[in-house]
Structures are given as C-alpha cells and as structure tokens.
C-alpha cells in the first residue's frame, strides 16, 4: 500500500487543493489465482482540502507539510506536486518543511515523459488525464465515508469533459465558472499511484529483482 498526496498549488483563480489518496491491490480472487492474474490497483481517497485563495505560499507549504505528516501514519507517503507554474522555490520550501518524499511534476504538451532528476518529472498532461479517466471508468476509486469535500470533488468531476484531439492532445475542460483544482490534485495522486512499482514484479521477476539487489 502507498499513499500519494496530490497538490495543485493555487495562483490567481483557483485555491490550492490537497488530495490524499491510498493505492492498494485487493486480494486475488480464486480465478485470478488460477490464471496468475494481478488484481488492478484501487484508489481510496481519504482526504480532500482547499487552502483559501490568497494564502501566502509559506502557509500553503506549512499546511501541506501537516497533511503529509498525517498521511505518513497510513503508509509510505509521497507528495506529488504540480510544479508547472510555481517553480523550484515551492519545491525547495517543501523539502525543508517535511520528511515526506516529494515528486515535482511539470506538465508538458509533448508525447514523452522525461525525468531530468530523481524527484522531477516532465510529463505530458495526456498521461495524467488518461490515468484518471481509466480509473474512473473502471470504477477503481472510492471515497472514505468521512472524506471532506467529496461532493465538491464529484461536482468537479461531473462537469469535466475528458477528450482527445485528432492530433492526440488530451484536454479536460470544466463548465464555465467552475474550478478544476480538486480534479487536478486528484489526477496527480492517481497518476502516481498507477505508476509501475515493485508490486508489479511477480514470481521469477521478483526473485530476479531480489538477486540483483544483493
């Protein structure tokens, strides 16, 4: 099980949004065991929060650090931050404020992801949109009963239109006058939770990985 804290840093229009998502694989069904199939990952949203518009970045960072500290009590936690507009200073402030792992994501309009450093991803927005759309369509996401702002999240999701242009560019547009901060934070958490990891190595693959690590 892993925990991703998706953070969409607010600027002039939208407030900062924080979404804590837990990613796990359910137990295998007898049929999956028989055919050595891996159950798909599922996502459980535990916390949704908006930091009021106009809050200075120092206080935004403090709040993210508090939420990250609480999330670390659930399991291995990683802050996944949209660094497209805020730049490196916010990332550096967060690194000084929390012991939680951090990944900075810079959205691009390209087709291939690059990773200029261990904690920075330059990622096509289509990858994040597709990850969320796939999880939603497969109904592999749920909200814990006491998760705050889940109705606001559902409203944002219902007003968004996920589409792909003829040139392969992904877009997601909300209804006029609506915010997209919660959906953006959710996209970051789900995208990170869907990325390949050690739980994708099974049987001989896992044994081979373990031998290589010795």
Label for each model-derived stretch:
Residues 1-107, 113-122, 126, 130, ...:
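RNase H-like, metal-dependent nuclease domains and their acidic two-metal-ion catalytic environment used
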